[in-house]
Amino acid sequence: MSDSKDELIRMFFDEEAILFGRFILTSGKESNYYINVKKLSTKPRALKLIAKLMAGEAQKRGITFDRVAGPELGAVPIATALALETEKPLVIVRKKPKGHGTGSQLEGEVKAGDKVLLVEDVTTTGGSVLRAAEVLEREGAEIAAIMVVVDREEGAEETIGAKYTFLPLVRVSELFARRKEPQKE
């Protein structure tokens, strides 16, 4: 494991970005833990590290892309940081077309044939990021890969991987393998 990835995993614990309790996820599933990547993505040091890791992973895998995209809301700061890191244009994918102005579901430009690196904060089943991929493809984009900060390992890799290259920076099993035990007082 790289030092940078190890640092990211430590940040999840240091910033208390893993919560335990009862949570309903975007997928509709119930979970006894919640991975709050948004908490990390509001911290400049963590956000910069995520962008650096994503850019490095794309380069290591030989993934070329013209644009970086992310679905609202959780992926927007991540996609923005990665766009800055790679100096590639940013595209934001809305959950639904806006009801005013142009009525577009995309903010930013996508041209037919553009290769897009689509990023997400957390995946469970992969449904949200797959819907974003469909929106981009309707506009003529090609999905170069889908990269996620944390994969919860609940089906997203199989679902997304059936059609796209799927690259999680961290799997939830890696987070839990490093989970700090409560200190005895």
UniProtKB/Swiss-Prot annotation:
The keyword Magnesium applies. Keywords: Glycosyltransferase, Magnesium, Pyrimidine biosynthesis, Transferase. SUPFAM superfamilies: PRTase-like. GO terms for molecular function: magnesium ion binding; orotate phosphoribosyltransferase activity. It comes from the Archaea. Orotate binds at T124, R152. It catalyses: orotidine 5'-phosphate + diphosphate = orotate + 5-phospho-alpha-D-ribose 1-diphosphate. Its cofactor is Mg(2+). Its EC number is 2.4.2.10. 5-phospho-alpha-D-ribose 1-diphosphate binds at R94, K95, K98, H100, E120, D121, V122, T123, T124, T125, G126, G127, S128. Gene3D superfamilies: 3.40.50.2020. InterPro entries: OPRT (IPR023031), Or_phspho_trans_dom (IPR004467), PRibTrfase_dom (IPR000836), PRTase-like (IPR029057). Catalyzes the transfer of a ribosyl phosphate group from 5-phosphoribose 1-diphosphate to orotate, leading to the formation of orotidine monophosphate (OMP). PANTHER family: OROTATE PHOSPHORIBOSYLTRANSFERASE, URIDINE 5'-MONOPHOSPHATE SYNTHASE. Homodimer. This is Orotate phosphoribosyltransferase. It comes from Thermococcus kodakarensis (strain ATCC BAA-918 / JCM 12380 / KOD1) (Pyrococcus kodakaraensis (strain KOD1)).
